[in-house]
């Protein structure tokens, strides 16, 4: 009940009337320097120590004046804005309607005949086609490396063969 009375006081903007006598004020411990600068009214503090709405009353009045000066028609609370639904709409849908909530639409468009298998096949075909159109150059580089490696090996073999002693020269006899 205290919560409802607190909310009602906040909405109406009235201050709380203390129920105890003013002569019997409880003695409070001395406040620190940080707390002394803040207003000591109970109404200005909310839970978690944030300041209430009584601190800036002039700004609220100015905002109300600017809002009232605009020619805006009042908005119906049952109107949906974007994906937000009003509470009354949700309650009606949940309790009154027998069908309840609709299931969310599937991710695949079944009207086109899509299925999970078809989308996977399309994805695989797309990747294969993409690889055929834009092949990686690693194959041609490897071929060039192997060709140059064979040339180097052939040159090395030929240089080794050139240094061999040919027996035909030694067979030649001088008389």
Swiss-Prot record:
Keyword RNA-binding appears in the UniProt entry: no
GO BP term, pick one: regulation of growth
UniProt note: phenotype after gene disruption: No visible phenotype under normal growth conditions. Roots of plants lacking LAZY2, LAZY3 and LAZY4 exhibit a negative gravitropic response, and grow upward in the opposite direrction of root gravitropism.
Cysteine-cysteine disulfides: none
Record's keyword annotation contains Oxidoreductase: no
Segments for region (Disordered): 9-39
Reported tissue expression: Specifically expressed in roots. Expressed in root tips of young seedlings.
Keywords of this entry: Growth regulation
Entries under InterPro entries matching the protein: LAZY (IPR044683)
Motif residue range(s): IGT motif: 44-50
Function summary: Involved in the regulation of root gravitropism. Functions redundantly with LAZY2 and LAZY4 in the control of root gravitropism. Functions redundantly with LAZY1, LAZY2 and LAZY4 to control plant architecture by coupling gravity sensing to the formation of auxin gradients.
PANTHER family xref list: OS03G0406300 PROTEIN (PTHR34045), PROTEIN LAZY 4 (PTHR34045:SF3)
Family listed: Belongs to the LAZY family.
UniProt protein name: Protein LAZY 3
Native organism: Arabidopsis thaliana
Classification of source organism: Eukaryota, Viridiplantae, Streptophyta, Embryophyta, Tracheophyta
Name of the gene this protein is made from: LAZY3
């Amino acid at each position: 009940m205290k919560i409802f009375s607190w909310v009602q006081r906040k909405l109406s903007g009235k201050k709380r009337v203390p129920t105890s006598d003013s002569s019997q004020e409880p003695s409070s411990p001395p406040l620190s320097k940080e707390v002394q600068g803040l207003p000591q009214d109970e109404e200005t503090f909310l839970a978690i120590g944030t300041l209430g709405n009584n601190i800036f009353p002039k700004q609220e009045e100015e905002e109300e004046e600017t809002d009232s000066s605009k020619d805006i028609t009042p908005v119906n609370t049952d109107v949906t804005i974007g994906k937000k639904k009003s509470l009354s709409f949700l309650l009606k849908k949940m309790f009154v309607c027998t069908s309840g909530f609709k299931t969310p639409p599937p991710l695949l468009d079944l009207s086109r005949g899509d299925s999970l298998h078809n989308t996977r096949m399309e994805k695989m075909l797309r990747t294969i086609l993409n690889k055929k159109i834009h092949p990686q150059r690693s194959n041609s580089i490897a071929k060039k490396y192997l060709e140059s490696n064979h040339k180097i090996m052939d040159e090395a073999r030929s240089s080794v063969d050139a240094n061999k002693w040919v027996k035909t020269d030694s067979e030649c006899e001088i008389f």
